[in-house]
Curated annotation (Swiss-Prot):
Enzyme class: transferase
The organism of origin for this protein: Burkholderia pseudomallei (strain 668)
Lineage: Bacteria, Pseudomonadati, Pseudomonadota, Betaproteobacteria, Burkholderiales
Record-given protein name: Homoserine kinase
Keywords: Amino-acid biosynthesis, ATP-binding, Kinase, Nucleotide-binding, Threonine biosynthesis, Transferase
Record bears the keyword DNA damage: no
Catalytic activity: L-homoserine + ATP = O-phospho-L-homoserine + ADP + H(+)
Gene giving rise to this polypeptide: thrB
Length: 331
């Protein structure tokens, strides 16, 4: 999240006329993230998040807002879009599509333990299954076609060694994506960006036997229809990684994957290509972070991420790609 488009008090007052949310009590920008303009909004009716979409068009946005509404109705804890006075789930602010969603309970856990990974794994699988009957389709817009378009744009900014890695991994992933095995992998709506700062945890209720409770997943604006295994790989590459080295933390990875499979067991094809998908997940974010770092957009409060983090993760995944997935984690 970030602030690319400023919203004045007068802008907000006009915008809020289309909502039955009471009076505005507080309004402030959210500095984290890199894609949209986001604001915490407190009214006399509750707490919300206002998002102005900087890249998604009004034609693309229905997939995202209706997906969140669909998941919320199926018991998945996600922000629910708030309907406007005309019944629609988004409108236009400063010439850009914008929406208000409910604010989830809890706080991000930026140093997750095994117990957090268990909660995330189970809910991610529930989310995948809940999305099976979602009728709208939107591809993951940061997948192979985008990588092919973006790598030439960032190539002038990287070293020769990095360029060789970018182009070599792109060729590897293109071959994987073209394979029959890839085509057979289960798919459906995916979050595609489920990092530890896109989930919230609340205090567990007494006598539940749980030390933590997942408040929910949010920031679905990179979501798309993709292979479920890609969504799992993206999640594991963030929640279950040793930050200094990029290596997987075996205990957290085992916990997340076991928990996921209590809800949806992996297929044989998913187990076979776990290494390839871990590489795909790392590559996607290395490419996007290089792009955002070297070709940034003007923004208030923008905090770009370090591209080197996912370069390290990708190199780690390639170094261990020859090994089969650990049987204790993926059976």
């Amino acid at each position: 999240m970030a602030v690319f488009t400023a919203v004045s008090d007068a802008d907000l007052a006009l915008w809020m006329r289309h909502y039955d949310l009471g009076d505005v009590v507080a309004f402030r920008g959210i500095p984290s993230g890199i894609e949209n303009s986001n604001f915490f909004l407190t009214t006399t009716r509750g707490e919300y998040v206002l998002t102005i979409f900087e890249n998604l068009t009004a034609g693309q946005l229905p997939f995202y807002v209706h997906l969140m509404s669909h998941l919320a109705k199926h018991g998945v804890p996600v922000p629910a879009p708030v309907a406007r006075d005309d019944g629609t789930l988004f409108g236009e602010l400063h010439g850009k599509p914008a929406a208000i969603v409910t604010k989830l309970e809890g706080a991000a856990q930026l140093a997750p333990g095994v117990e957090h990974c268990v909660e995330v794994g189970q809910m991610l699988a529930r989310m995948h299954l809940a999305g099976r009957d979602y009728p709208r389709h939107q591809p993951n817009l940061r997948s192979l076609p985008w990588w092919r378009d973006t790598v030439p744009a960032i190539a002038p900014f990287v070293t020769g060694e990095q360029r060789a890695l970018l182009e070599g991994e792109l060729a590897h992933q293109a071959a994987f994506f073209a394979s029959d095995d890839y085509a057979a992998l289960p798919e459906g709506p995916c979050h595609c960006d489920l990092f530890r700062d896109n989930a919230l945890f609340a205090h567990a209720e007494p006598d539940t036997g749980h030390s933590v409770r997942l408040g929910g997943f949010f920031d679905f604006y990179f979501a798309g229809c993709d292979k479920w295994l890609f969504d799992v790989a993206v999640t594991v590459n963030d929640w279950c990684v040793d930050l200094p080295t990029g290596a997987l933390d075996a205990a957290r990875a085992d916990a997340l994957l076991r928990a996921y499979q209590t809800v949806r067991p992996f297929t044989a094809g998913e187990r076979r290509h776990w290494g390839d998908m871990l590489r795909a997940g790392a590559y996607r974010f290395w490419v996007s972070r290089l792009y955002d770092f070297h070709l940034p957009r003007a923004a208030q409060m923008l905090k770009p991420h370090d591209p080197g983090h996912f370069e390290r993760i990708l190199r780690e995944r390639i170094a261990h790609a020859g090994a089969p997935p650990e049987t204790h984690a993926c059976n």
